Amino acid sequence: MVLAELIGKVRTDYKILTRSLLTGVNQIDQFMIPVPFDHEENALQKSLEMRRRAMEHLENGGVIVLFPSGKVASSETMFGKVVEGDWNPFTAKLIQKSGADVLPVFFPGSNSRIYQIANQISATLRQGLLIYEVVHAMNKPQKPLIGNIIKQDEISSWKSDPRGFMKWLREKTIKLGSNG
């Protein structure tokens, strides 16, 4: 939501790829494209529709906001360090096929330890706490760190290696956090 507010100050032609759990709110629904969970009914069809809508929006000159790992950064154990997951090659395909430039944004911090523990216990508990975490974060000052735009000239050099591109972009984005 913080990112939506920042983008909305500059442009209104953005869409956020987000879990369907966080969509359906009338005031913001026009800015959302739902990403289905794997276990949802018709997940494959919904996923293909999500990809089609995202690509169409980019082809029309719009902005797509996404979280490339497809999940919230979390710890691998109840009390472990929070880690950003590997980034999905779908993101590379979306960027490369659309010809879009990329603006990396890093959000410092992480969800609460209770969320991290819930993540180890139950997907349902984790999802329930995610809504709490979003609401809780909205009531605190956020300081996203914004990198430089990465142009297609640089992106195109990764065309034959989408996984390498995602690894490089992930490291570049996370590094914003150590420089901030």
What is the meaning of each model-derived region?
Residues 1-43:
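Catalytic core of membrane glycerolipid acyltransferases/transacylases, capturing the structured
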Residues 44-180:
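Non-catalytic C-terminal accessory region of glycerolipid acyltransferases
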